[in-house]
């Protein structure tokens, strides 16, 4: 799949979704990067549209692939941006089973990936008491303490 550079990414999210699911690793990275950039805009990031695409579980999967730290970083950053939205947005990230992956990324050893995992877990735990408890139960506090004692 290829994008029409003349159109905004938000108008081409279906093409971006296909990039994430195709067999080409380079397309996975391009798709994750495009979603992350679309979600990084200050005014009205398209969180709902990205959630409706059904790509959050795929972003979780890609963020746990140690063969490409750059892809891990982009996918985790996209998840971080979704989790920074409304409670419903954050719940979608949680429902995609992202929390255990994010906690495991705290020991990834790649600074950028670790930093994004910390941000994402902070966004999730800061949303509500139940989400905070979920993050704590997943072992995030112990993993983060290891980061500062290393």
Outline where the language-model segments fall.
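Structural signature of alpha-helical solenoid repeat scaffolds
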Residues: 35-37, 80-81, 122-123, 145, ...
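Short inter-helical turns and helix N-cap capping residues of alpha-solenoid HEAT/ARM repeat scaffolds
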Residues: 23-25, 67-68, 109-110
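Elongated alpha-helical scaffolds that mediate protein-protein interactions in large eukaryotic proteins
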Residues: 2-9, 19-22, 26-30, 38-54, ...
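Buried hydrophobic core positions in alpha-solenoid tandem helical repeats
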Residues: 15-18, 56-61, 101-103, 121, ...
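Alpha-helical scaffolds that organize eukaryotic protein assemblies
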Residues: 112-115, 120-134, 140-142
